[in-house]
């Protein structure tokens, strides 16, 4: 039986699920960009791409060379095809305008070009996270200047989301709103090939991912929940748990997606005015969409991530996602 490439899968989705041709083309272009990013990541020190740029992004985070390279690759790959009305990125203060010499399309692309890039110099898995939204009608005019308001849609409005993980293998995880598929890059073939047909997050788990060094700063519900996990079989949950923390959201969530668990990056007391560390639009929303489509759940502790109405492009949020039963337990603790 012949292998199913990403292109073939998307064509079949167009035939069977009425996936628009423009959306199919957009996903293929993003996938090609991810292949190019994977190539740069894999060269490491040999390609002169490691280290810092000496600049900061809008979040005040030091930009790695590969942050900027990956951002440029995604912009250049997607700006000319006529399928996008605009783009937004972790690495840019404002929305990216499609150059006037190119036609505009019906979609918006939001992305973190290289999640986990602080780990790139130590050869830890990193990745690209992306989200696709429909552009509101009032911004579809060729001459209309796009501003961030076009992007401020709740995660329930996403039409597609995915991430590429650059590890021992390069994989693309994708949802079009009808389940989650996994594609592995066949470097000899030069294509992403369907290798994981119907990814499901196990409902229960014995693993969790959180940065324990921040424990003293967490809110009481998170303190309580993690304390119960650490108590193991002698505690109220009557089960031993293992902790895993890679400090790369793509890597941590990918592990949870494939074998179950709970990923937590809660708000803490050091910056009370900030509701969390991770960005809603291009980290929490796409990952939450994927996790929910795989049978898991995602919350900020008080409400479903996908129901949050964004107020700004780079809005931060507390994130707790993964196996459904555990997410529901943490949510219940927050509501007591």
From Swiss-Prot:
EC assignment: 3.1.3.11
Signal peptide segment: none
Binding residues for substrate: 115-118, 211, 277
Binding site for Mg(2+) 2: 112, 115, 283
Pfam families, sorted: FBPase, FBPase_C
Cofactor info, note text: Binds 2 magnesium ions per subunit.
Annotated positions binding Mg(2+) 1: 90, 112, 114
Alphabetical list of InterPro entries matching this protein: FBPase_C_dom, FBPase_class-1, FBPase_N, FBPtase
HAMAP family from the UniProt entry: FBPase_class1
Similarity remark: Belongs to the FBPase class 1 family.
Protein's recorded name: Fructose-1,6-bisphosphatase class 1
